[in-house]
Design a protein with these regions (language model features):
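Helix-rich C-terminal or lid/interface subdomains of diverse kinases
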Residues: 342-366
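Conserved NTP-binding catalytic cores of kinases and kinase-like/nucleotidyltransferase enzymes
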Residues: 1-140, 259-262, 266, 290-299
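ATP-binding pocket architecture of kinase catalytic cores
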Residues: 78-106, 114-213
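Secondary-structure capping and boundary motifs in well-ordered enzyme cores
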Residues: 59-60, 135, 171, 270, ...
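Catalytic activation segment of kinase domains across protein kinase-like and atypical kinase folds
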Residues: 207-209, 274-276, 283-322
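ATP-dependent phospho-/nucleotidyl transfer catalytic cores
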Residues: 152-279, 290-294
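Active-site-adjacent bridging/hinge elements
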Residues: 45, 86, 142-158, 252-258, ...
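Active-site activation/catalytic loop segments of kinase-like enzymes and analogous catalytic loops
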Residues: 110, 114, 306-350
Length: 366
């Protein structure tokens, strides 16, 4: 049954169950909705139910949608049935700018079924319910909540703050290893074709919502603002990036690259040897880390919005784009290029990363 505030509920395309579009709707649906959702998703038996919501709080952050952390109780405790939950909504009904990114989560929801198959090679938060309504762009995802700093899991690390993270190179090695395992498993054909076929190659889809390209006048204003910022805060940027020569070249190159956006996307899509299913935004803040008895650092990944087949240069850049400049170069050289043989493969990986970076940032620079 649709909730009491109908504009906050939609009927899902996958299960045909009405689900809330935001935290207000979820709170109104309460334990009844959670019971129905977990049953229809197959994680809760008909003889079991959600009996209590012990914790319910909104979580700030992220570029799209609203988020909730919850703790629930069940009538019967069952192994593998999680009580600490994290809820993601694609919509932000109170913020039109954030709501524009609502399409980002559709692949995330479709990814739920694939992530549960035994052949899936890396750790992801276990999905207890996921559905979407394509027509309105409304999606909902309920997963286990990863408790950072508890039971062997390291604390949460923020992107762009590598200097606060112990052994950053080891962490990026673990992160890139996870990406490589997923890409390799997909290309080997070990994942169910019926599920991977739901993620066709679409280079243009790897972005947060629909961002309108900047006009030449607006782009020129951005460059002027950037130059003023560099002049005012020179210590915040590496010396070579803040030099007048670099800024002049940037002002000349970015419009030219943006003009060839479709050519760049075509080149990324055409290089079939480097295409695979992968995480598009595997920054360090979308990962969690732990060590096993072998003392090897392991990595799990969350926030699978825009997941799909892509050029691996895009995936690697998505993982490294928040790293310190020197760490980015070191991690790519150590973990990607020095492991490639022959050298032509290493060169191709570097080229793909550069093209992926250009295609991501030059068409719609922040």
């Amino acid at each position: 049954m649709i909730g009491p505030e109908n504009h906050r509920w939609v009927v899902g395309d996958q299960f045909g169950l009405a689900f809330p579009a935001d935290p207000v709707g979820l709170r109104s649906g309460g334990t009844r909705f959670l019971t129905d959702a977990f049953r229809v998703a197959g994680v809760l038996g008909d003889d079991n139910s959600v009996t209590r919501i012990k914790e319910f709080r909104e979580v700030a952050g992220g570029s799209t949608g609203r988020k909730v952390a919850m703790e629930v109780e069940y009538d019967k405790a069952v192994a593998g049935l999680h009580t600490d939950l994290f809820v993601k909504f694609s919509r932000d009904l109170d913020n039109p700018i954030r709501d524009r990114g609502r399409t980002q989560m559709e692949p995330d929801v479709r990814f739920a079924s694939l992530s549960r198959v035994p052949e899936f090679p890396i750790a992801v938060p276990y999905v207890q319910f996921a559905d979407y309504q394509h027509r309105s762009g409304t999606r909902m995802l309920i997963t286990e909540r990863i408790r950072y700093g508890d039971k062997g899991i390291e604390r949460h690390y923020h992107k762009c703050l590598d200097y606060e993270m112990p052994e950053p190179l080891d962490h990026y090695r673990a992160l890139l290893t996870a990406l490589a395992r997923l890409a390799g498993t997909h290309r080997s054909g070990c994942l169910p074709a019926g599920l991977t076929s739901r993620f066709p190659l679409d280079v243009a889809a790897a972005t947060v919502g629909d961002r309108a390209p900047l006009s030449p006048d607006k782009l020129e204003r951005r460059f002027t603002q950037l130059a003023e910022f560099v002049a005012t805060h020179p210590a915040l940027l590496p010396a070579n990036v803040g030099s007048p020569e670099f800024l002049a070249r940037l002002r000349e190159d970015v419009p030219r690259i943006a003009h060839h956006e479709h050519t760049i996307a075509g080149q990324l899509a055409a290089d079939s040897d480097y295409l695979a299913l992968c995480h598009w935004n595997a920054n360090i803040d979308n990962a969690w880390f732990w060590r096993r008895g072998d003392d090897v650092l392991h990595c799990g990944l969350m926030d699978w919005g825009c997941v799909g087949q892509m050029n691996m240069g895009m995936a690697i850049w998505g993982a490294m784009s928040g790293a310190e400049t020197d760490m980015c170069g070191t991690a790519i050289s150590t973990n990607c290029c020095t492991c490639s043989s022959p050298k032509s493969i290493a060169a191709a990986v570097r080229t793909s990363i550069r093209i992926g970076c250009a295609g991501t940032h030059c068409s719609t620079p922040p």
